[in-house]
Amino acid sequence: MDYEALLDRIMRTVDAEAYLPLADVVPAEHKAALDEIGQALQGAHFDPAALRARVIQLQKLGQLDRVAMYSALHVIAAHPRVNNLEEAAAMAAQQEMAALEEGGPRLQANLASVERHRGVIAFMKGHTDLALDYFSRAFERQRAAGNLANVLACLLRLGDQAEARDLLRQVRGAFPAELTAALDDMIHKDPDLALLRTETPA
């Protein structure tokens, strides 16, 4: 892995004047529907088939667009209790086509979501280096804490703690405070990032 190239790709996206906190924000018109889906996914006994049907219904009701629908269907398929990664990959491909057809001002954000979903599949299949590339591309498209957290998790999974700590220190010195605060919060909550907790404020 060419870490210098990886760090360069990430750090080249730094521009505090142009910072747009997109990745962890959803369009207002989708928020209620996505909150409902998120709560169902966290339930102890969620029914994948019923939730898929509900997602499709929400799209027909106009509460989700096609991009968000396919994204949600991917998340259901990739859920550990479902673990249908072929379906998850198919939904990511459909999401990409829907994003390209829709275009518009959210195109980069929508494509970043596709990159994240593909990164999740690669990560779950044990291809951590490939997942790292997907997550890095997601961050290039959409500068937000969630995308950086995925990059750091991959570095840690690969055993590259020094590189992860170096990246975190560089990010802390270059990125807007709201992004680093959100990233610190994720580090304290996500067990995949636990090895970085000594690098964050208490």
Walk through the language-model features, giving the residues of each.
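Conserved positions within tetratricopeptide repeat
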Residues: L20-A23, P48-R52, A68, A89-A90, ...
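TPR/TPR-like (Sel1-like) alpha-helical repeat modules
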Residues: L152-L179
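"A position-specific structural signal for the A-helix of alpha-solenoid helical repeats
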Residues: K31, D35-G38, A53, Y70-V75, ...
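Hydrophobic/aromatic side-chain positions at a characteristic register within alpha-helices
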Residues: V14, L41, Q59, P80-R81, ...
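Flexible helix-coil transition and linker loops at the boundaries of alpha-helical arrays
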Residues: P21-V25, P48, V55-A68, N83, ...
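Alpha-helical adaptor scaffolds
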Residues: Y70-E140, G146, R157, Q170-G173
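TPR-repeat structural position
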Residues: A16-Y19, H45-P48, L85-E86, T128, ...
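Start-of-helix signal in alpha-solenoid helical-repeat scaffolds, especially tetratricopeptide repeats
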Residues: Y3, H30, P48, D65-S71, ...
